């Protein structure tokens, strides 16, 4: 009898051990792995195709029923510029042999060739640098990607490519920006030129910095132009670009009426509000124009987590968990990706 009991106990432990082993194998990927995998899934179709000069041939455009008839080629710069502004800091991490490290290395190789093709008139993926005013917006994101991670982007480009970007950015000066957050797009390309020692339009920088300071309302919120609009543009554009432009001005001893420290404090106050919009279930209210920019609504939280630290009362784990849950909810829905990603 005792022998049977002992055998049953041993057998039970064996079953439990097998169960625990299976559980270990079936554990979901970490938050970090999910972020890295999602970044790769979004970036790979754009960068791989563009590195081969095949983005404009293969990218499937979806046009709104209310499309205004503008040149469709603005979509290619929009896809490339905004992608690189988002992932360039990630690509600047030190190389390693992890699965994530291999993803970063591959994306960076594609990105460097894509940067080259974007300004090469002989490339099928030469981007649209003249014409619609929208190109000012998306060129600013390319400039922002250089500012955010120069060692992984700008400094690795050949001299011919760098000179082409300089001329393309200067060529955008003929575009008159709208009297709202677009002043920052105009200023972003000039801030980048200033950062690399090129001649910059200091008047454009002054106007943008001064006007945004005038449009600051209170409690972390800027007005997007003379009139306030309740949307996510404080996170999409205003706080991130304003802070980054001011950082360049400070580094280059270009005097401004507002300090980088103050601008960051304003952004951190905004972060307190924006984090509280995320529900325990990982949802957030959809309001205001451009709501389809999705995770861009929390760019200020991501920027602070990466570069400045979070405001008092917000922990890294709290923000990481909130953003991870939002991403899982958003990108697990069918229709985000097609069979070609």
Feature roles, as predicted:
Residues 71-100:
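N-terminal carbohydrate-binding/catalytic regions of secreted carbohydrate-active enzymes
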């Amino acid at each position: 009898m005792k022998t049977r009991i002992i055998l049953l106990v041993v057998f039970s432990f064996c079953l439990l051990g097998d169960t625990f082993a299976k559980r270990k194998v079936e554990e979901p990927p970490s938050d970090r792995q999910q972020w890295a995998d999602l970044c790769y899934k979004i970036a790979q179709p754009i960068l791989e195709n563009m590195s081969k000069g095949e983005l404009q041939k293969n990218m499937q455009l979806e046009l709104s029923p209310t499309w205004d008839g503008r040149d469709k080629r603005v979509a290619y710069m929009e896809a490339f510029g905004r992608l690189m502004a988002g992932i360039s800091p990630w690509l600047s991490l030190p190389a390693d042999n992890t699965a994530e490290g291999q993803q970063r290395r591959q994306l960076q190789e594609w990105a460097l060739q894509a940067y080259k093709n974007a300004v090469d008139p002989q490339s099928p993926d030469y981007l649209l640098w003249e014409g619609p005013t929208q190109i000012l917006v998306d060129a600013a994101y390319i400039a922002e990607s250089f500012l955010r991670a120069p060692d992984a982007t700008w400094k690795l480009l050949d001299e011919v490519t760098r000179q082409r970007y300089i001329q393309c950015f200067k060529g955008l000066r003929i575009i008159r920006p709208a009297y709202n957050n677009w002043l920052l797009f105009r200023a972003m390309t000039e801030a980048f030129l200033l950062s690399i020692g090129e001649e910059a339009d200091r008047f454009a920088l002054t106007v943008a910095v001064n006007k945004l300071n005038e449009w600051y309302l209170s409690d972390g919120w800027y007005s997007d132009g003379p009139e306030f609009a309740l949307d996510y543009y404080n996170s999409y554009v205003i706080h991130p670009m304003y802070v980054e432009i001011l950082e360049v001005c400070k580094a280059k001893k270009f005097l401004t009426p507002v300090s980088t420290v103050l601008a960051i404090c304003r952004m951190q106050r905004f972060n307190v509000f924006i984090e509280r919009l995320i529900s325990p279930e990982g949802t957030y209210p959809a309001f205001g124009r451009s709501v389809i920019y999705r995770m861009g609504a929390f760019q200020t939280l991501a920027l602070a987590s990466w570069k400045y630290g979070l405001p008092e009362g917000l922990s890294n784990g709290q923000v990481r968990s909130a953003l991870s849950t939002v991403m899982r909810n958003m990108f697990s829905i069918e229709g985000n990706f097609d069979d070609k990603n």
